[in-house]
Regions:
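An acidic/histidine-cluster motif and surrounding catalytic segment
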Residues: 1-91, 95-148
Length: 148
């Protein structure tokens, strides 16, 4: 399965840390979108609009330019997944995989989208002792996605 690691071009330190924490992982670096460099007009020209009045219901903060860049990075990967018609393991550059992580085993699961790591903002629902259904996941630290 193709593995992409999202990393800002000026954050080589984060990629070095990722490599140190995940030394045996083969991956392709995905150049993250730098949200602070994108103007509102460019977002509109690409078909995106942001609600300037939106407030995060948990953190009680407005959407930041960094969060817009983060979304766009993931959105471009989702488009790539559909275009290439292949599943992708998506990791942000601060993800740390455990020694028990088995990409071959996990890729056998029947799924469209599987969170592998997130910040839990609410209790998750246990499915079978190995899998849980997040109620309100926060962050997109690690997940697998299929083109379906």
């Amino acid at each position: 399965m193709k593995t992409l690691v999202i990393n800002l071009s000026d954050r080589k330190d984060r990629l070095q840390s990722f490599n140190a924490n995940n030394p045996y992982l083969e991956y392709e670096r995905f150049n993250a979108v730098e949200g602070y460099k994108i103007g509102y007009e460019k977002l509109l020209s690409q078909g995106f609009d942001t609600d300037h009045n939106w407030i995060d219901p948990i953190l009680k903060t407005p959407l930041t330019k960094g969060e817009v860049g983060c979304f766009l990075s993931h959105w471009h990967i989702w488009c790539k997944c559909i275009e290439k018609n292949e599943p992708i393991l998506v990791l942000e550059d601060d993800a740390v995989l455990t020694d028990k992580f088995d990409i071959e085993e996990i890729s056998k699961l029947s799924y469209d989208f599987v969170y592998l790591g997130w910040k839990e903002m609410d209790k998750s629902e246990d499915i079978d002792g190995k899998l849980v259904k997040p109620v309100y996941p926060y962050w997109t630290l690690a997940y697998m996605i299929r083109p379906e």
